[in-house]
Amino acid sequence: MSQEGLSYAAAGVDIEAYERALERVKPLIAATHGKEVAEGVGPFAGLYALPGGGHLAASADGVGTKIKVAIATGNHRVIGADIVSHCVNDIATASARPLFFLDYFATGKLDPAVFGQLIEGMSEACRDAGCALLGGETAEMPGVYALGDYDLAGFIVGLVEQDARREAPSAGDVLVGLRSSGLHTNGYSLARKVFEGAALSPDLSAALMAPHLCYLAEMQKLPWKAAAHITGGGIPGNLPRALPVGLAAVVHKDAWKPNPIFAEIRRRGKVSDDEMWGTFNMGLGMILVMEASAVPEGVTVVGEVVEQSGPERVTFR
């Protein structure tokens, strides 16, 4: 297959088709919600009101086909930490303190060494985030997974204190970007297609297996109003989820330099600019909305919030 104009859809992941499917089932999901559900499908975490005040925040995630790179490199500990960090970041956008985490591990035949590495990574990441690895499910499914293959998913619950809700974003606020280590856990189907047949050099392996950073500690120190975890769909697909209706974002591409791995993916795969920005985090793992006067020294301002004047919620300049 020619690599001319590689895209995420051509690599087997059609985000637009997923979004259409999700829209169709949203009424079924909403039909299960009572008055306790403060946030449902859409934000990065669901919120469930507690009788005494405050909310539980919950999220579920996977690590995608980064697992294939882990299998090729033998580095499974990173994957274990990645799934925890991904989940923690999602509920951190709701100002939640992680309480407990559960995992689901499925494989064709259990490899104790691989399983041990995954649990080591999860345990370390849970300790760093201050949450309990409460339990999980381990499933051997021969005939469903090929020998050596596996999948991993995570589920997290956190607590949003009664006084933790934040002021809503408004026009004039600024966007602060928190740097990523690389792809984190998204875009790997496209990246793997780009590097298909290429030797995994130590440098390339390290870049592709860079850990999904956890932003909890950093976010707890900053005065933000809203936060967007930049995962599947990139900045255009995630930043609008942090903005109220009627607001949009202007993002300045020259405010930071994406990690070298993104330039390599673009070059090798002849991937278009729109495809790159709509698939990968491009060097920012989290974007915070802050009041301009509250921005501390040393952070990277990458854009601003404006009144929405057209169909686009995110404009790049």
What spans do the regions from the language model cover?
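A structural signal for small-residue-enriched, beta-sheet-centric alpha/beta enzyme cores
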Residues: L175-L183, A227-G232
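Short, acidic Gly/Pro/Ser/Thr-rich loop/turn segments
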Residues: V63-K66, E161-A164, L183-T185, G233-G237, ...
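Glycine-/charge-enriched secondary-structure boundary and capping motifs
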Residues: S2-G12, V114-A132, Y145-Y150, G197-L208, ...
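Glycine-rich phosphate/pyrophosphate-binding loop regions near the starts of catalytic domains
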Residues: P27-S181, E291
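N-terminal amphipathic/basic leader segments beginning at the initiator methionine
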Residues: S2-K35
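Short, compositionally biased
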Residues: Y188-A198
